[in-house]
From Swiss-Prot:
This is Inner membrane-spanning protein YciB. It comes from Coxiella burnetii (strain Dugway 5J108-111). The keyword Transit peptide does not apply. InterPro entries: YciB. Plays a role in cell envelope biogenesis, maintenance of cell envelope integrity and membrane homeostasis.
């Protein structure tokens, strides 16, 4: 359910684009992202960092898109957000006792430190590549292809990557249990 909630602004953007075009879709995504943050706050009395970061950039770049009537601003939003995630993930190797992925999942999964480090770096690399891939699609294909890639392409890549991470975690969690006997 959280997955759908997280993807709701993208889904609304996609639907609005298909019916009314990039500018209405941009405005819709701006409104829905703000609603998403508000609903999350009302429900949990806290903010989800991912939602807030996305909201900031969709409001900023969405406003530029609407004011200047140029879709390039909204097309850059995913790349900027992905690269911020990559920088934060990579930077967590140098700040604090544990990497960001370790801090996020340590209550749920027990893994060796080396495995946590590799997971964190793989997520950082994944977001870096996803940002580059978004720019490749932006500058080499039309807006319709970019919108389809934004929903279906990134979703498929994310699911495949998460599945690969799950297998990697399962293998190393199994090794950890075997080695501790």
């Amino acid at each position: 359910m959280k997955f759908l909630f997280d993807y709701f602004p993208i889904i609304c953007f996609f639907v609005a684009y298909k019916f009314w075009g990039i500018y209405i879709a941009t405005a819709a995504a701006m409104v829905v992202s703000a609603l998403q943050v508000a609903i999350y706050w009302i429900r949990f009395r806290r903010f989800e960092k991912f939602h807030v970061i996305t909201l900031i950039f969709i409001l900023l770049l969405g406003s530029f898109t609407l004011v200047f009537h140029n879709a390039i601003f909204i097309k850059w939003k995913p790349t900027i957000v992905y690269w911020i995630f990559a920088i934060v993930l990579f930077g967590s190797h140098f700040f604090g006792k544990h990497t960001l992925v370790h801090r996020m999942l340590k209550e749920k999964i027990e893994l060796p430190a080396k495995t946590w480090s590799r997971l964190n770096l793989s997520w950082a690399l994944f977001f870096l590549i996803l940002g580059v891939l978004n720019l490749f699609v932006v500058y080499n294909f039309d807006t319709n292809t970019w919108v389809n890639f934004k929903l279906f392409g990134t979703l498929a890549l994310m699911l495949v990557f998460i599945l690969g991470q799950a297998f990697y975690i399962a293998r190393h969690a199994q090794n950890l249990k075997t080695n501790s006997r």
